């Protein structure tokens, strides 16, 4: 069974824990805006993405660097500067894929923008910091109208203090895959930035802007599977099915287990009437998902929402078997058991979820089940 390595989170970040992950909640894309409303394409250079504005550098000097020569104390001071009211007073915004300068101006950031800013400021303060990539979390979103999956990815920051390593993430409850956060190059970090911006533009219907950012992502890292998936979606949306097929094929050559590319490629083959190829990809997708605890959990959630509790229980149990230390999975199973009237099993899974989640999760999970109990009693009273 997979047991993730311990992660260190800066306690001050707890103020943002109610915010979602970097999964993006973009506007509907069923109707493209008129050409005249499309924002001109201004792709910031790599230097502009990381550039610290003078006023922010002055704040860093006063609130972090001048306060202590200790790297550990500077790290804590940096977090206080970023989230404190006397500093940036940073707010979470899932759609704020900003440069460091834009974060300074807007005082908002998503996971990616926060990470790039944090690493830039930490290095300026003499703290060893790096951008880290998490291969699999809930880092893609579904456009229900268009029926496609966009890849955006998840990143966080890693720091080293006196030989100890810590991860700084906007969500301390984020569930990482088997590999956990992996350090990435500056080029890959920039590829994430441009890819995110491109996904945002595409969701807004600005296909010209989307392509400009996706192209910039490819320039930084041609081996980044997510951007090829997104280029495939964009090419298909523009009616260039040959280019879409090439882009999606390239995404799958780079990562043959990527759900988004498998989903989009199989849909494209169906669209082209290539049913045999589509079926082959669908079989591969199902095979990947059977051994993927994240996919099993999401399938369980979908089944639960559809009222298919036996199916939901089956998916949740598989997720737990594959990743037995994830308190979220145990709570999903507890919830499904409870709704199905299997109360003893629900209690068992709830206790497991509370034990794994620790004190912060215990009251929250109990409150959720208490709410479900009231709802269930109301439903039974109406019968």
Regions of interest found by a model, annotated:
Residues 220, 254, 287-288, 321-323, ...:
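Structural marker of alpha-solenoid helical repeat scaffolds
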Residues 39-103:
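Secondary-structure boundary elements
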Residues 191, 225-226, 259-260, 293-294, ...:
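Helix-start (N-cap) detector for alpha-helical repeat units in TPR-like alpha-solenoids
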Residues 196, 230, 264, 298, ...:
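Canonical tetratricopeptide repeat
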Residues 91-228, 233, 237, 242-256, ...:
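Long, contiguous interaction/recruitment modules in multidomain scaffold/adaptor proteins
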């Amino acid at each position: 069974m997979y047991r993730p390595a311990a992660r260190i989170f800066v306690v001050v970040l707890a103020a943002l824990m109610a915010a979602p992950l970097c999964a993006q909640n973009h506007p509907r894309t069923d109707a493209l805006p008129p050409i005249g409303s499309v924002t001109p394409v201004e792709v910031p250079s790599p230097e502009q993405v990381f550039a610290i504005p003078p006023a922010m550098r002055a704040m860093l000097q006063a609130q972090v660097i001048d306060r202590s020569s200790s790297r550990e104390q500077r790290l804590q001071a940096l977090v206080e500067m970023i989230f404190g009211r006397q500093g940036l007073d940073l707010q979470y915004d899932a759609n704020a894929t900003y440069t460091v300068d834009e974060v300074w101006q807007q005082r908002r950031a998503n996971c990616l923008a926060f990470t790039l800013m944090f690493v830039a400021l930490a290095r300026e303060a003499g703290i060893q910091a790096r951008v880290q990539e998490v291969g699999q979390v809930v880092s893609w979103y579904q456009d229900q109208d268009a029926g496609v999956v966009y890849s955006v990815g998840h990143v966080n920051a890693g720091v080293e203090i006196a030989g100890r390593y810590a991860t700084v993430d906007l969500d301390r409850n984020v569930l990482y895959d088997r590999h956990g956060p992996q350090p990435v190059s500056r080029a890959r970090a920039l590829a994430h930035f441009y890819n995110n911006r491109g996904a945002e533009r595409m969701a807004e219907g600005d296909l010209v802007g989307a392509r400009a950012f996706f192209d910039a992502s490819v320039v930084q890292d041609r081996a980044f599977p997510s951007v090829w998936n997104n280029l495939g979606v964009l090419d298909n949306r523009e009616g260039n099915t040959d280019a879409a097929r090439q882009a999606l094929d390239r995404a799958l050559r780079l990562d043959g287990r990527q759900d988004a590319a498998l989903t989009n490629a199989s849909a494209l083959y169906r669209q082209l009437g290539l049913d045999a190829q589509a079926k082959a990809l669908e079989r591969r997708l199902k095979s990947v998902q059977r051994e993927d605890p994240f996919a099993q959990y999401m399938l369980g959630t979908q089944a639960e929402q559809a009222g298919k509790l036996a199916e939901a229980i089956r998916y949740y149990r598989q997720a737990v078997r594959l990743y037995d230390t994830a308190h979220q999975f145990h709570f999903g199973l507890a919830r499904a058991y409870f709704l199905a009237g299997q109360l003893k099993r629900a209690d068992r899974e709830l206790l497991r979820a509370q034990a794994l989640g620790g004190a912060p999760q215990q009251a929250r999970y109990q409150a959720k089940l208490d709410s479900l109990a009231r709802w269930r009693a109301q439903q039974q009273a109406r019968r």
